Amino acid sequence: MANTDDIYEDRLVFAAYDERVKELFKVFAEGLAQGEPERPSQERFRRALRFAQRARNLAMQAVQQEKTAEAEALAAAPAS
């Protein structure tokens, strides 16, 4: 069964990603409202979105590696 802390960490990463996407969209929409050209604004948004996705994926990998390391340490610990 999954540890509550593990689920909490996963949710934090996804919540942070959600917030970042919201911020990116607001910047994108505001730029369009200010008269920025659509094509460059869209490219900038897409590039920022890719970086946010990459950061989310790397963070999830790190969380997963930490979970694995903790599980291995518990398994290797002598039974009391």
Identify the meaning behind each predicted range.
Residues 2-80:
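Soluble, non-transmembrane alpha-helical interaction regions
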